[in-house]
Design a protein with these regions (language model features):
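A conserved helix-loop-strand patch within extracytoplasmic ligand-binding domains
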Residues: 4-23
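Structural recognition of the beta-strand scaffold that forms the well-ordered cores
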Residues: 21-25, 73-76
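Short coil/turn segments
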Residues: 24-30, 131
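A short mid-domain helix/strand-loop element embedded in enzyme catalytic domains
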Residues: 28-43
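Extracytoplasmic/secreted envelope proteins and their assembly/folding machinery
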Residues: 32, 36, 56-59, 63, ...
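Flexible, solvent-exposed loop/hinge segments that line or gate ligand/substrate-binding clefts
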Residues: 41-43, 51-154
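C-terminal functional modules
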Residues: 119, 132-133, 140-188
Length: 188
């Protein structure tokens, strides 16, 4: 499927203008600049409308469209609540960008086994005050070993998106995760 084919673009059109509608990044986000560059360099503006509204609100519309049997196109990342709602490999797949700032990578739940993601891959790592870590070497050792699966982080993000975002609720999420993964947690 080529989004530059107007017949395919219409499948993702929600406002009737014949262009695909794609939830992009909120104005001011770093990813907005990369998406804008992709649109400019690839001439995508003729075929796709980037929706730059509030990301959560725009994604709520995408999810509703998907649940109503419509085709959807959106920018996302992991971990993120969106992939906790629209499951990668079941509901949606990663699609390839024509180029990327980084090398081609193996990506599960994609249109093919190795592809250009269009964006550099980010790592999630803990950060802490240097003086605190010097005073607490066991904490530093713990943080170096700790690793939570992206799917679990996305699931927790989904809970927050559904309203469970108070400090008390987030602490409960952490306690539940630790209890369900006690052996792994203890190994850290």
């Amino acid at each position: 499927m080529c989004i530059r084919d107007r017949n395919h673009a219409k499948e993702f059109d929600s406002n009737g203008d014949g262009k695909a509608d794609m939830v992009a990044c909120h104005p001011g986000w770093g990813c907005e600049k990369i998406i804008s560059r992709h649109f400019e360099e690839l001439g995508l503006g003729e075929f796709i409308n980037p929706i730059k509204a509030d990301y959560s609100a725009a994604m709520a519309d995408i999810i509703s469209r998907y649940k109503n049997g419509k085709s959807v196109l959106f920018y996302t990342w992991t971990p993120n609540w969106t992939v906790g709602t629209l499951k990668l490999g079941e509901d949606v797949v990663w699609i390839e960008a024509p180029f990327s700032e980084t090398k081609v990578v193996s990506v599960p739940n994609a249109t093919k086994s190795k592809l250009n993601m269009g964006f550099g891959v980010n790592d999630i790592r803990p950060a802490a005050n240097v003086d605190f870590l010097k005073a607490n070497p066991k904490v530093e050792k713990f943080l170096k070993k700790a690793s939570i699966p992206l799917a679990d982080i996305a699931a927790q993000n989904l809970k927050m998106n559904k309203g469970e975002k108070s400090e008390k609720a987030i602490k409960k999420h952490a306690e539940e995760w630790i209890k369900a993964n006690q052996k792994t947690f203890n190994s850290w």
